[in-house]
Amino acid sequence: MPEQEPVPPTETTSPESDTPESSDAPAFDPRPILARMPGLPGVYRYFDADGNILYVGKARDLKKRVSSYFNKTQLSPRIAMMVAKIARIDTTVVRTEAEALLLENNLIKALAPRYNILFRDDKSYPFLRLTGHKFPRMAYYRGATDRKHQYFGPFPSAHAVRESMQILQKVFQLRTCEDTVFNNRTRPCLLHQIHRCTGPCVGAISEDDYARDVSNAARFLQGRETEVLEGLQSKMEAHAVQLEFEQAAAVRDQIAALSTVLKRQAVEEVGQARDIDILAVAVQGGRACVNLAMVRGGRHLGDKAYFPAHVDEAAMIVEEGDEADGSAHEGAAADTDQLPIDRIAARVLSAFMVQHYLDQAPPPIVVVSHRPADSALVEALSMQAGRKITLVRQPQGQRKTWLEMAAQGAGLALARRLAEQGSQEARTRALAETIGLDLEDLATLRIECFDISHTAGEATQASCVVFHHHEMQNSEYRRYNIADITPGDDYAAMRQVLTRRYQKLVEQLQEAGGDPAGDGGDGVPRMPRVVLIDGGKGQVEVARQVFEELGLDIGLLVGVAKGEGRKVGLETLVFADGRPSLELGQGSAALMLVAQIRDEAHRFAITGMRARRAKARTTSRLEEIEGVGARRRQKLLTRFGGLRGVMAASIDELASVEGISRTLAEEIYRQLH
């Protein structure tokens, strides 16, 4: 598709935007801005009186679409509730509906409006990487790609990458060790002994033979299995003709291993092998699930489920707006018998595809369970990718099987989520009632929990985990390295982490004009409604002092004190504002949620502390040995590939390193064992 010259969008803002609505201010009058609004493609944004974003929408005809919200006398209760909150309207005019669709979803991802279908940002997808080394290393990789190495994927999950790596290790025996280990190894590792690596580090395989294995592995990952099998067959026969029966047997084992793998996997027929995404949607109980299955080179790599927020409200809003300006997909609009649940699925699918493929181009073929609701979707995705994207609604053969598998996976994942959500919402409600929180929407309850972890004062680290929208928000977790305190002083560690966390937050709120005691507005950092402290009265008192120094509400603070004998279920909630402590009992739903969040904070702190401690010990153990300076330490680490190699070396091997005497080698060995 030829690239279009970008045209600057035209922005319009309602005049009411400069006058926040007060309790006695007149109701918002949309007529002035509607009178000036053009009948052109574009994006509109609704804001409430506090400047919070309510909704972002796109339209083929802005005037018709926006007017429809204010002209209708019969609006659904949820849409009427949103319209009643509107205090400002911003619009952006673009050239085409496809451009409007892309801009709309850029804004949705950036602003996260209350009434839009939202898919949470996830980590970037992982790849399998073959490095550009003379003897390429096979590795799991996540991040930006470059031209120095070969990348295969993306894969839907880390498990899918590691599963493929295990296959390649078994069939082609490629190395997985770090280059520093590879360059300094003097004897083969365990992987060579169990036939999972050909041992290029010690010259057990020639550069040419290893390069052939790498080439075969790359072809396998590209879906060219037949070429690989034919090449191996020819190689085996050539060895047999030369009476090289041992080499022929090794190639025969490769063929057998590869054939076994191919029988287990669902692979598309030769000649049809393509990169394909399969998208299946399930809708139930006001929630939805999009299951994305990835096929690369004709091989099914696995799937991953996504769960959007605000499904009901957003689907209704878009549905009514589409009828006003004719933006609905022609096929969908003509299907008067389409069930409401299918229309919601179509909306969810459209939202997912645009939000998901904004940051990464889709493959040439996307198989879908429902016809997407937006007529401009294919054009927008093709424009974004710079090539034609084909949607397949009714696949045949292996692709049909894959779609059925994805649909079944979506249904099962949604059923699990609904069951979990029911119990989780009940726990959230129980906790809110127990500690006296007055919330209109339980999903807005934001809880931050802190824990301190160390080993006898070494490598002290604090963790902060976040619970919001009835689930843990992994992307918002933070670790804090604690320094300049007496080792083992948990009170000082808690004071330091709380000060660092909330002093910065208060400053950000003040810069943005927000209220530290409030929830923040659009783009403004948000204070939690509850701050859980893993500890009893002493820890809570430290937290109270920090909050008072920062001018924060001490009523947010709740300590989780361990019960008698540290038994689970006997915990007590300790409040900083003078309320009496609460013993909830083992059957308490509120305590279950508190324990879940606290245990997650503890897990997160422990893993960070262990990693930090291991890193510190890796560098410090040799530093502590008298006579081993920086130069000798570097020679030892280079020769043996790291501290583990040094620890595994004998006294004779240590003494063979330049600059290490027999006496010093004995001392090093004694100190490390």
Swiss-Prot record:
Chief place where the protein resides: cytoplasm
Subcellular location: Cytoplasm
Compositional bias of kind Low complexity: 10-23
Domain of life: Bacteria
InterPro entries tied to this protein: GIY-YIG_endonuc (IPR000305), GIY-YIG_endonuc_sf (IPR035901), GIY-YIG_UvrC_Cho (IPR047296), RuvA_2-like (IPR010994), UVR_dom (IPR001943), UVR_dom_sf (IPR036876), UvrABC_protein_C (IPR050066), UvrC (IPR004791)
Gene3D superfamilies: 5' to 3' exonuclease, C-terminal subdomain (1.10.150.20), GIY-YIG endonuclease (3.40.1440.10), UVR domain (4.10.860.10), UvrC, RNAse H endonuclease domain (3.30.420.340)
Keywords linked to the UniProt accession: Cytoplasm, DNA damage, DNA excision, DNA repair, Excision nuclease, SOS response
Subunit description: Interacts with UvrB in an incision complex.
HAMAP family, sorted: UvrC (MF_00203)
Annotated function: The UvrABC repair system catalyzes the recognition and processing of DNA lesions. UvrC both incises the 5' and 3' sides of the lesion. The N-terminal half is responsible for the 3' incision and the C-terminal half is responsible for the 5' incision.
Protein name: UvrABC system protein C
Organism: Cupriavidus metallidurans (strain ATCC 43123 / DSM 2839 / NBRC 102507 / CH34)
Name of the gene encoding the protein in the UniProt record: uvrC
